[in-house]
Amino acid sequence: MSEDIRRGPGRPPKKRVVPNFERKGILEKPVRPQSRLEFSYDNPLIFKNLFIYFKNLKSKNILVRCTPTEITFFSRDQSQASFVIATIDGKNVNHYYASDVFWLGINRELVEKMFNSIDRSFLKITIVHRYDKPETLFFIFTDFDIDKECTYQITVSEPELDMDLIEMEKSISEERLKNYPLRWEFTSKQLKKTFSDLSNYTELVTIEKLGGDTPLHLYFQKFNSISYHEMYKSSNKINLTSTIPKSQVFQINVKIAHIKSLASAMVTDKIRILCEENGNLIFQSEMDALLLNTITLNNMI
């Protein structure tokens, strides 16, 4: 056995050499002539985490919209109170091509099982949809250390579109997001702890902020029983920003069960929370090229 291969006890293994993948972004033509969609990305675990999130929310079916510039995943949680919209911009991946705008329907449980078998040995995922096999979506995973390629063929359908779900995309348009009066950031741990603790005492919590440089205030009060107040006094520590005029008060009541289930499902370390005047909440996080938005409707209370 050569000296390069033999290792003494306790000595760490040789450092893995990771290929340098160029991110070319959007292509004018596909690499494979039969492709209607081609998506190549050097971070397969992002998809694994996304489908773990869908699993945690007990989502069933997932709509996939492919456009010439991006791919977007739409789904609902089990309670139907939250809507998930996850987008990957084609310019941020190794290469991306979609011939036109089209929709695919995939079963979450089927795809989830596939991603369960994917670990860090796989450094690239390629997704292909072909003109000659419209009922099939190809997932190709590559392990460059041993030059292994694993290909899954998943049956897809032309879905019945959930227009209420798709309409939720307007809530996260660039123009709409500018007008949200209150936003801040929590770690996933803080979000989970806050709403888990609150759930022991009450079903509703009030989120409140006065205009100007004032703390974020979460509280509940039960008549002749118990009250609780949670104040965030340093806006910079939670990246708190607001457009609330000094003479006004922003206040909404939120159903804790909806937020608690989301907090338990989160797969990112940091979450940006945006509040709309009608009480709707947006939970926004990022994983490399993926932008993950979850919209929770206050009128579902």
UniProtKB/Swiss-Prot annotation:
Keyword Cell membrane annotated: no
Presence of the UniProt keyword Transcription in the record: no
Keywords, comma-separated and alphabetical: Host-virus interaction, Inhibition of host innate immune response by virus, Inhibition of host IRF3 by virus, Inhibition of host RLR pathway by virus, Late protein, Viral immunoevasion
Induction per the UniProt record: Expressed in the late phase of the viral replicative cycle.
InterPro entries: DNA_clamp_sf (IPR046938)
Family: Belongs to the asfivirus E301R family.
Quaternary structure and partners: Interacts with host IRF3.
Function statement: Plays a role in the inhibition of host innate immune system by acting as a negatively regulator of type I interferon production. Mechanistically, interacts with and prevents host IRF3 nuclear localization to inhibit its transcriptional activity.
Name of this chain's protein: Uncharacterized protein E301R
